[in-house]
Amino acid sequence: MTSITTIPLSTLRSSLPARPDAAAAPQRWRVADIEALYALPFMDLLFRAQQVHRANFDANQVQLSTLLSIKTGGCAEDCGYCPQSSHFETEVKASKLMALDEVMAAAQAAKDQGATRFCMGAAWSRPKERDMERVTEMVREVRGLGLETCMTLGMLEAEQAQALKDAGLDYYNHNLDSSPEFYGSIISTRTYQDRLDTLENVRGAGINVCCGGIVGMGESRAQRAGLVAQLANLEPYPESVPINNLVAVEGTPLADTPPLDPFEFVRTIAVARITMPRTMVRLSAGREQMDEALQALCFMAGANSIFYGDRLLTTSNPQADKDRQLFARLGLKVQGERPAATVQG
């Protein structure tokens, strides 16, 4: 039997517990440490990530999340990847904030399809005070269905974060998007510190943090490692980390960006799992461009949640039936449901 070659733990400062029931020691991750993880042979990296994953989660279980755009387009920010920006000519048309009954119908449909988490996104730079009453009502009503709630509304002041907490919000999403070094290449209207300040306000209100980023925007591996380092070194690191693979949309500055190598995306999932052992690593945008084998590798690397349904904000997503078929073929259980039957043949 061939042994697996690994870099010494002292070199990588691994967060892998000594025993499956042992707590991972807090640590600061250097970008160089994370680059060393990226550089591992692919099979060794996945083996490592699986060890960490199994020490903290049921490796054969995934959570289904549904994401609804409650206010689409017309955003004042100039994020180069985003078709909702008012700075770019895309097919996305601006809309007003959805009515509560429309949101509730979508939430009920998501629950009926097996989702246990419902995320609501609004294309705002930051929510206006006149909108806070409506979005907090959405949180209360969706939570009343028994769904875990998440919102992404842009930058938040401390008082707004507290209002969402008082309404019962479980998670707030505000992505870092990239490493600090690459950030200026894609966004000029919002600083990196603005994002960190919002995360601090969310954490200060006692809301769980959902924070990840986008890969495949033309960044280097070192810059991908820099993003993971930023996430892993947040104190504490996020409870939820969505990893997005760029969906290049016509009309945006990144429309012609070459796609990221698929194995590099899997490596990013694995590195996120190793550096943030107890976070929910969520396969997010870009999944429609992945074949089933690539998605299976992502689950092996430590992803344990997907966004489920036909759309992610303004981009398409694999059909729910296809996801169910894939879960059955892989023997994956959906959180909150009985295990799927194994498909033969």
From Swiss-Prot:
<dbReference type="InterPro" id="IPR007197">
    <property type="entry name" value="rSAM"/>
</dbReference>
<dbReference type="InterPro" id="IPR006638">
    <property type="entry name" value="Elp3/MiaA/NifB-like_rSAM"/>
</dbReference>
<dbReference type="Pfam" id="PF04055">
    <property type="entry name" value="Radical_SAM"/>
</dbReference>
<keyword id="KW-0408">Iron</keyword>
<dbReference type="InterPro" id="IPR010722">
    <property type="entry name" value="BATS_dom"/>
</dbReference>
<dbReference type="InterPro" id="IPR013785">
    <property type="entry name" value="Aldolase_TIM"/>
</dbReference>
<feature type="domain" description="Radical SAM core">
    <location>
        <begin position="60"/>
        <end position="287"/>
    </location>
</feature>
<comment type="subunit">
    <text>Homodimer.</text>
</comment>
<dbReference type="GO" id="GO:0051537">
    <property type="term" value="F:2 iron, 2 sulfur cluster binding"/>
</dbReference>
<dbReference type="InterPro" id="IPR002684">
    <property type="entry name" value="Biotin_synth/BioAB"/>
</dbReference>
<keyword id="KW-0479">Metal-binding</keyword>
<dbReference type="Pfam" id="PF06968">
    <property type="entry name" value="BATS"/>
</dbReference>
<dbReference type="GO" id="GO:0005506">
    <property type="term" value="F:iron ion binding"/>
</dbReference>
<protein>
    <recommendedName>
        <fullName>Biotin synthase</fullName>
        <ecNumber>2.8.1.6</ecNumber>
    </recommendedName>
</protein>
<comment type="function">
    <text>Catalyzes the conversion of dethiobiotin (DTB) to biotin by the insertion of a sulfur atom into dethiobiotin via a radical-based mechanism.</text>
</comment>
<comment type="similarity">
    <text>Belongs to the radical SAM superfamily. Biotin synthase family.</text>
</comment>
<keyword id="KW-0808">Transferase</keyword>
<feature type="binding site">
    <location>
        <position position="150"/>
    </location>
    <ligand>
        <name>[2Fe-2S] cluster</name>
    </ligand>
</feature>
<comment type="pathway">
    <text>Cofactor biosynthesis; biotin biosynthesis; biotin from 7,8-diaminononanoate: step 2/2.</text>
</comment>
<feature type="binding site">
    <location>
        <position position="75"/>
    </location>
    <ligand>
        <name>[4Fe-4S] cluster</name>
    </ligand>
</feature>
<keyword id="KW-0004">4Fe-4S</keyword>
<keyword id="KW-0411">Iron-sulfur</keyword>
<dbReference type="GO" id="GO:0009102">
    <property type="term" value="P:biotin biosynthetic process"/>
</dbReference>
<feature type="binding site">
    <location>
        <position position="79"/>
    </location>
    <ligand>
        <name>[4Fe-4S] cluster</name>
    </ligand>
</feature>
<keyword id="KW-0093">Biotin biosynthesis</keyword>
<feature type="binding site">
    <location>
        <position position="210"/>
    </location>
    <ligand>
        <name>[2Fe-2S] cluster</name>
    </ligand>
</feature>
<feature type="binding site">
    <location>
        <position position="282"/>
    </location>
    <ligand>
        <name>[2Fe-2S] cluster</name>
    </ligand>
</feature>
<keyword id="KW-0949">S-adenosyl-L-methionine</keyword>
<feature type="binding site">
    <location>
        <position position="119"/>
    </location>
    <ligand>
        <name>[2Fe-2S] cluster</name>
    </ligand>
</feature>
<dbReference type="InterPro" id="IPR024177">
    <property type="entry name" value="Biotin_synthase"/>
</dbReference>
<dbReference type="GO" id="GO:0004076">
    <property type="term" value="F:biotin synthase activity"/>
</dbReference>
<dbReference type="GO" id="GO:0051539">
    <property type="term" value="F:4 iron, 4 sulfur cluster binding"/>
</dbReference>
<feature type="binding site">
    <location>
        <position position="82"/>
    </location>
    <ligand>
        <name>[4Fe-4S] cluster</name>
    </ligand>
</feature>
<keyword id="KW-0001">2Fe-2S</keyword>
